Amino acid sequence: MVVNDFYDVHLLIHDIDLFDSGCADKIKCSIYESIVDSVPVCKITFNSSPDFLNNYPIIDGTKVIIQIKSDIFSIDDQYIFRVMKFSALPFGNMFSFSIEAVIDFYELFRAPSKYSTNNNSCEVFNTVMKKNQLAGSIHQTQDKQLWVPSETNLGQWLSYIAAHGWSSQQSGFYWFMNKSKNLFYLDIDKLIHESKNIVKFYYGDTEDEDIDEQIVRYKNIIIKTTPGEENLFNRGYDGECHHFDLSSYSTKQTNANKVRATSEIININKELSNGLGKSLLSFDVGNHHKNYFIAEMQNRRVLSTYSTYVNLSCELFRPIKLSQVCTIDATSITREDGEIESLKIKYIISKIVTNISGSTVNMDVELCTQGYNGLSTESY
């Protein structure tokens, strides 16, 4: 089905295209991907006749294929999900169907024992990529140890590894998979300071849309700042951190550490409040890299400084990628003399919601950067 004169869109369940088959109406599909919630999901709603399930039975694991093509914007994407939740409610003489699905990578929910390695944490992610023939990007780490999973699935274990990833006293690691099933394990400090492939967001109407994939127009913008302790990356600064010391065979408090993470806005070269509150899910036998405990505190601290969020509504879907570095034209402050000063701040695309219906294909984008707290008391 052609939408907006720009896109050829297909939504397939059991190889039946909901848009073109005529078996459903009021079809809406939203794809959610985020660097905080590492696994992409989608939600589909539509109305159809009561015999829809007789013809196309939907159960856990049913494949959902979403295709978006555009010659103008050089898009030829296919996203595959698997049903994890389904409901059908009577609505007059029709049924209202709701489907929630997760990215088609079941390996994330299996036991990850075959990925154990005595190497840097980045090699765990590289092994997952190679064994499952995935694309993506992995940043180098300096945290060699024996990485062995406990009773977790692969997704949980990757989150645990990322929380203890380390490369330097500036690093802040996180991982995610995007809707194209590409795997990423990134250092946010390295990403924002070394990236050269920068997307530029400009305010403008649809008819002003630039074909350049590095230029994206938006219609609405909301900017909000949250204190670090409320940031999604952070679980709070209070509490003490302890570890088990084999030499004395007792628990000891982990020393606070000074980090050299970079920020032009706030001072994060300070002690980490005697450690961040944390809990250990299993007994630690002493096999950990020398920065194992400090890494968890530093990762939380560095990531929590990214506490300014910008939400953009874009009327058209563009091939931007999660975690790309970008700039926006609305970043400025008003000085005391009334002059408006532009702030050339780099943002990271932290969330993308792709919305598809019979009349439009658009996206809502969330950007994040280090907080404005303390930068200026003037309006911005």
Where are the regions a protein language model picked out?
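Polar/acidic, low-complexity leader/linker segments enriched in S/T/G and N/D
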Residues: M1-I27
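Short conserved beta-strand and strand-loop elements enriched in small hydrophobics
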Residues: V9-L12, T62-D71, Q324-I340
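Short beta-strand and beta-hairpin "edge-sheet" elements
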Residues: C23-D25, S70-A101, A330, T334-D364
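An acidic/polar, Gly/Ser/Thr-rich interaction patch typically located in mid-to-C-terminal regions
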Residues: I31-P57, D205-Y380
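Flexible glycine-/small-residue-rich
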Residues: F46-S48, A101-I103, D187-D189, T369
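Surface-exposed cap/loop segments at beta↔alpha junctions
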Residues: F52-H139
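Short beta-strand-centered interaction patches in the first periplasmic/extracellular domains
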Residues: M94, I103, I138-I223
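Sec/Tat-exported extracytoplasmic proteins
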Residues: N132, A162-G165, A330
